[in-house]
Amino acid sequence: MVSVSEIRKPQRAEGPATILAIGTANPANCVEQSTYPDFYFKITNSEHKTVLKEKFQRMCDKSMIKRRYMYLTEEILKENPSLCEYMAPSLDARQDMVVVEVPRLGKEAAVKAIKEWGQPKSKITHLIFCTTSGVDMPGADYQLTKLLGLRPYVKRYMMYQQGCFAGGTVLRLAKDLAENNKGARVLVVCSEVTAVTFRGPSDTHLDSLVGQALFGDGAAALIVGSDPVPEIEKPIFEMVWTAQTIAPDSEGAIDGHLREQGLTFHLLKDVPGIVSKNIDKALVEAFKPLGISDYNSIFWIAHPGGPAILDQVEQKLGLKPEKMRATREVLSEYGNMSSACVLFILDQMRKKSTQDGLNTTGEGLEWGVLFGFGPGLTIETVVLHSVAI
């Protein structure tokens, strides 16, 4: 008689979960941040709100964002005026857009990742799809399976309404799947479209304006698996350890509510303070077993919720300015793309490390950390091990 342990052992991979490929995609419509307040107040018929517009201009100027990419063009917004009002019932119009655009943008990123991976898509065993943009059944995971022509028995996991921390969540789940299913190859896709959150300005809901100044559209895809096939699969980063925690005394810090008016966000002013207060504990838990206490000796991939969060984390930990370089570059070029952001930063870091002639994918360093922050206030932590270039 065979024991349970004898059955389980050959089902598990030998090595750690490894990121084997990364692909990214954005809508064609590029929006320059410097002129966005003029466009935003004009398209929402709010040009008479001059004081509010000046406030929004200051938000955009301080955002450290140069440009963003958005599915919503001037033409689409003119055809859907309910999206341009502050709280007009508009969920049907928003849903009609995102249930098509979210999987379409996800496919664009996935095709790039699969091409870099170099293996046939028939070898994909699992699919994780994550979006905060719209809900449907069957979900975006099903739609992507059809769009890519994946096998019908691919094991799918659909994550809706997680928010900005979810780039860490999908990595945590992919790690568990890859390491506990020998030979598994997991396609991970995060796709975010701001059509679900766009709305006109209001004097009484300034935290909504913060979102209008920060959020952009984008999709990122990864292939994750353990025990890479030599000379065919090329490791980029290894995932060594993961954790998720709810920051104490943070209830209501970041909330999102899906209503007839779309997805509305509420933020407390102290979100940067809450993140910076709790990040040290997360780092100790993650890196004490490795004997690492100098956080300037590791590479950093942090969700760029906004410049204030990055500034306070740098100050709290005494980080050198270059530690957040990849994060700030992605924020500058794309804005806050919610769950997709940290995956864009992974891509940016490995490419820049190669361009700069460094000897590892992690800016020449061996160990690194990936952080996701979002509703809850929830913090995701992933310890990464770089790969020699």
UniProtKB/Swiss-Prot annotation:
Q: Which reaction does it catalyse?
A: (E)-4-coumaroyl-CoA + 3 malonyl-CoA + 3 H(+) = 2',4,4',6'-tetrahydroxychalcone + 3 CO2 + 4 CoA
Q: List GO molecular-function terms, semicolon-separated.
A: naringenin-chalcone synthase activity
Record's InterPro entries? Chalcone/stilbene_synt_C (IPR012328), Chalcone/stilbene_synt_N (IPR001099), Chalcone/stilbene_synthase_AS (IPR018088), Polyketide_synthase_type-III (IPR011141), Thiolase-like (IPR016039)
Q: Write out the pathway annotation from the protein's UniProt entry.
A: Secondary metabolite biosynthesis; flavonoid biosynthesis
Sorted keywords for this record are: Acyltransferase, Flavonoid biosynthesis, Transferase
Per the UniProt entry, the Enzyme Commission number(s) are: 2.3.1.74
Q: Under which name does UniProt file this protein?
A: Chalcone synthase 1
